[in-house]
Amino acid sequence: MRTHDDTWDIRTSVGATAVMVAAARAVETSKPEPLIRDPYARMLVTNANAGVIWEAMLDQEMVAKVEAIDAETAATVEHMRSYQAVRTNFFDTYFADAVAAGIRQVVILASGLDSRAYRLDWPAGTTVYEIDQPQVLAYKSATLAENGVTPAAERREVAIDLRQDWPSALRAAGFDPSARTAWLAEGLLMYLPAEAQDRLFTQIGELSCAGSRIAAETAGNHADERREQMRERFRKVAQTLGLEQTIDVHELIYHDPDRAPLGQWLNEHGWRANAQNACDEMHRVGRWVEGVPMADDKQAYSDFVTAERL
């Protein structure tokens, strides 16, 4: 059960979800024609010791094993992996467009095991700020450093919970509010109460000059129903395969029916926003997977929101 002041490392609570996402990136990277390439994802997963079920996600044969038990769950596993690749690609492209427009200041909120500071081609003079729990940032930077991996940009850690005074910590790390910034909130908002989400974007607005950009992933209105269907199927399959589930992602999420649609909120608070539905984006890049629950309901899937400060 979440509390207002809970903390975590890479093996527990919200921190462990970063391992799951990194596992999906690792699987995608190993494909013959990957949509994205994250050469550090597998390393970050295997060194985390976050639980058997997360490492099992690295298994290329996992979908076939699950399919032998339940075809719809197998499709859902493949869809989840594909979704993570599409989401990563969308936001990689967002950053590429931002730096092409001359932006040299980047902030990744709740960065988890995001390795963009290491794997993307950043122009000279780019600074990437990563905000997350201290133990999560420490694990990532230590693991990569121990394996001889160095950042491709100036990387600065801001080790603080987003429920604390992170704007002051960000400024103390060298952030310049007068410079255009590209912000990212990927895989974050579902773990915040509605009030905290509004406060977060209010704070971002206060730190963003005209021409700054933001990108975020938001859940659809019917996402809870789809997640519940997936949860029950995953639980049954995990039991059959003998995989222990160390966390229940469903219990980490804030189920807030009054959460304001992010695109609308941004348009009303000094930004010009657009939203791309995840289903449409998966179809656009040829990575949609058939046979998943609620496939005909776009509101059961995420939106990728991008906006520019006016």
UniProtKB/Swiss-Prot annotation:
Binding site for S-adenosyl-L-methionine: 132, 161-162
EC nos: 2.1.1.-
Keyword Methyltransferase: yes
UniProt entry tagged with the keyword DNA damage: no
Domain of life: Bacteria
MF (Gene Ontology): methyltransferase activity
Classification via InterPro entries: Ppm1/Ppm2/Tcmp, SAM-dependent_MTases_sf, SAM_mthyl_Trfase_ML2640-like
Protein keywords: Methyltransferase, S-adenosyl-L-methionine, Transferase
One annotated GO biological process: methylation
Gene3D superfamilies, per the entry: Vaccinia Virus protein VP39
Record-stated family: Belongs to the UPF0677 family.
Function: Exhibits S-adenosyl-L-methionine-dependent methyltransferase activity.
Name of this protein: Putative S-adenosyl-L-methionine-dependent methyltransferase MUL_4762
Native source organism of the sequence: Mycobacterium ulcerans (strain Agy99)
